[in-house]
């Protein structure tokens, strides 16, 4: 067990809650102590839902451990079924309750309810939230479709032609507390509809048990988020012969590749690629003169596997960035992330320790960070621009407006979210660079009103920061002046390298010449 202030994923029962909360006519009875009810806040505060998750907690206390906690479980299950009248019941236990070994799933199945009961055995001390969500969706799909296994022929992707109708697909993987899932579904449905393809079921988001039973009415499955849906897609392929897509439509090239993959599987005529490229503004802007200063910018990427891999492809192939680091906290996606890292000639970082990520970020010295909410905090400490591309996220990353990551509009959103921090960074650098100019002296900073910092105070503040008495190093005025000309997002690295060079050469005072020599030494 590891004590930490912050974690990328919750325990697996939080993943199960995500699936239950995403669906209708399903209830989740969770054997857990009172303290585990904190998970409700994730949905009401972060996701900003209008209702609580469909979860009943047994909320046992210390005094209950001396008695029969199994009876407490049965009492809560009975009350939940009578009150909420679900069509399917999920039963599981939290990490604390797992130690008691009451086996609530087995207890529920022995109570004689006339409904499907899914017993969730989620190993809390070896697995995490995304695995819990994936396993819950997999067990739910398996339970509701088990009677149809072997009762029909394998499903052909060309069945729609025989039936004389438009092809149908399922969109699998979107869930609550996923990154922009709600808007991604709308965007992908729109793209599929333009291609003459109907959506049969979207699951788990917005689906009910009857919808899960209808999954086999479609020709193929769209695996939109591999962390959540890949296990279910594999099971449907093994038992019903349903093909599924592997391309994640994030970015222009991936969206075009996704459309091609769907067309190939369904044997539909392909749409002209040139027409598709004009659906988004990203390709035009990335070729324009205005964006030339973005070329070659160093970028560090960390997030869930799906979004980290997609971000790396967009950064390298569509925006001309140099990816200097990539990693994920999703151990289930480690193999794919390592393969992507190998293509980029960098080493993949697979960890759920945010301090390791911050350390790697510091060493890579990027000009832009693409990460989670935690990387935003780390980047702020390091003075590096950052855009959030993945869960875990804060409430500001769940916008009320339409803001997908996938498809054509998703590419527009991504471009704005990624490039604006760099543009603002350039603006801040120019202000910082010319802060000693006459227009920035006292009396000329009209844009700051009465809050303007006095130029003298600003210079004194910089002088204190630049000197390093611990190492016996002093920055001269010429050295400080030259250092301010370096963009702020790489200034820290330049300052550190110059001081290392000065210590190595035994130079007590750093002038502009020392800075030039250090630059030549480290080049």
From Swiss-Prot:
Q: How is the cofactor bound?
A: Binds 1 [4Fe-4S] cluster per heterodimer. The cluster is bound at the heterodimer interface by residues from both subunits.
Annotated positions binding [4Fe-4S] cluster: 36
Q: Where on the tree of life does the source sit, at the highest rank?
A: Bacteria
Annotated catalysed reactions: chlorophyllide a + oxidized 2[4Fe-4S]-[ferredoxin] + 2 ADP + 2 phosphate = protochlorophyllide a + reduced 2[4Fe-4S]-[ferredoxin] + 2 ATP + 2 H2O
Q: State the species of origin.
A: Prochlorococcus marinus (strain MIT 9215)
Q: How does this protein assemble?
A: Protochlorophyllide reductase is composed of three subunits; ChlL, ChlN and ChlB. Forms a heterotetramer of two ChlB and two ChlN subunits.
Q: Which NCBIfam families match?
A: DPOR_BchB, PRK02910.1-4
Tell me a Gene Ontology molecular-function term this record carries.
oxidoreductase activity, acting on iron-sulfur proteins as donors
What EC identifiers does the entry list?
1.3.7.7
A Pfam family annotated for this chain is Oxidored_nitro
Instruction: Enumerate the cofactors the protein uses.
Output: [4Fe-4S] cluster
The pathway this protein participates in, as annotated, is: Porphyrin-containing compound metabolism; chlorophyll biosynthesis (light-independent)
Keyword Iron annotated: yes
Q: Does the keyword Ligase apply?
A: no
The enzyme class is oxidoreductase
Swiss-Prot/TrEMBL keywords: 4Fe-4S, ATP-binding, Chlorophyll biosynthesis, Iron, Iron-sulfur, Metal-binding, Nucleotide-binding, Oxidoreductase, Photosynthesis
Chain positions recorded as substrate binding sites: 425-426
> Which family, according to the similarity comment?
Belongs to the ChlB/BchB/BchZ family.
Q: What is this protein called?
A: Light-independent protochlorophyllide reductase subunit B
Q: Per the UniProt entry, what are the Gene Ontology biological process annotations, in alphabetical order?
A: light-independent chlorophyll biosynthetic process; photosynthesis, dark reaction
What are the disulphide bonds in this sequence? none
Outline what the protein does: Component of the dark-operative protochlorophyllide reductase (DPOR) that uses Mg-ATP and reduced ferredoxin to reduce ring D of protochlorophyllide (Pchlide) to form chlorophyllide a (Chlide). This reaction is light-independent. The NB-protein (ChlN-ChlB) is the catalytic component of the complex.
- Catalytic site: 290
């Amino acid at each position: 067990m590891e004590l930490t202030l912050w974690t990328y994923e919750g325990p697996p029962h939080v993943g199960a809650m995500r699936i239950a909360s995403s669906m209708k006519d399903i209830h989740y009875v969770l054997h857990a102590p009172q303290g585990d009810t904190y998970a409700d806040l994730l949905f009401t505060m972060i996701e900003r839902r209008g209702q609580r998750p469909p979860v009943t907690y047994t909320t046992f206390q210390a005094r209950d451990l001396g008695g029969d906690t199994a009876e407490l479980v049965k009492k809560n299950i009975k009350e939940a079924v009578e009150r909420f009248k679900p069509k399917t019941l999920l039963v599981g236990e939290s990490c604390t309750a797992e130690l008691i070994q009451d086996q609530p799933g087995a207890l529920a199945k022995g109570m004689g309810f006339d409904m499907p009961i899914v017993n969730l055995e989620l190993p809390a001390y070896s697995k995490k939230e995304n695995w819990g969500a994936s396993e819950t969706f997999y067990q739910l799909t398996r339970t509701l479709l088990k009677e149809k296994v072997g009762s029909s022929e394998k499903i052909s992707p060309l069945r729609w032609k025989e039936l004389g109708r438009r092809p149908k697909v399922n969109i699998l993987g979107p869930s609550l507390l996923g990154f922009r899932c709600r808007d991604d579904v709308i965007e992908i449905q729109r793209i599929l509809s333009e291609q003459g393809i109907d959506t049969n079921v979207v699951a788990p988001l917005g689906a009910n048990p009857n919808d899960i039973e209808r999954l086999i009415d479609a020709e193929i499955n769209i695996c939109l988020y591999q962390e959540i849906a890949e296990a279910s897609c594999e099971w449907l392929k093994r038992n019903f012969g349903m093909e599924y897509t592997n391309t994640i439509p994030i970015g222009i090239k991936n969206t075009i590749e996704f459309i091609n993959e769907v067309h190939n599987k369904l044997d539909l005529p392909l749409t002209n690629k040139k027409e598709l490229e004009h659906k988004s503004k990203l390709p035009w802007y990335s070729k324009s003169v205005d964006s030339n200063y973005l070329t070659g910018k160093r970028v560090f990427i960390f997030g869930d596997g799906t979004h980290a891999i997609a971000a790396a492809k967009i950064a390298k192939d569509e925006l001309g960035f140099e990816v200097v680091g990539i990693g994920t906290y999703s151990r289930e996606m480690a193999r794919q992330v390592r393969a992507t890292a190998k293509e980029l000639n960098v080493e993949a970082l697979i960890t759920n320790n945010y301090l390791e990520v911050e350390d790697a970020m510091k060493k890579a010295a990027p000009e832009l960070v693409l990460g989670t909410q935690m990387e935003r905090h780390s980047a702020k400490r390091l003075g590096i621009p950052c855009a959030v591309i993945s869960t875990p996220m804060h409430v500001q990353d769940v916008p009320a407006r339409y803001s997908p990551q996938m498809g054509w509009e998703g590419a527009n959103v991504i471009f704005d979210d990624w490039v604006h921090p760099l543009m603002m960074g350039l603006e801040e650098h120019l202000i910082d660079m010319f802060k000693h100019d006459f227009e920035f002296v006292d009396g000329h900073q009209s844009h700051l009103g009465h809050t303007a910092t006095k130029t003298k105070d600003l210079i004194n503040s910089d002088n204190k920061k630049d000197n390093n008495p611990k190492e016996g190093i002093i920055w001269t005025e010429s050295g400080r002046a030259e250092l301010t000309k370096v963009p702020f997002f790489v200034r820290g690295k330049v300052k550190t390298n110059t001081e290392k060079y000065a210590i190595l050469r035994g130079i007590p005072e750093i002038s502009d010449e020392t800075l030039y020599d250090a630059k030549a030494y480290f080049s």
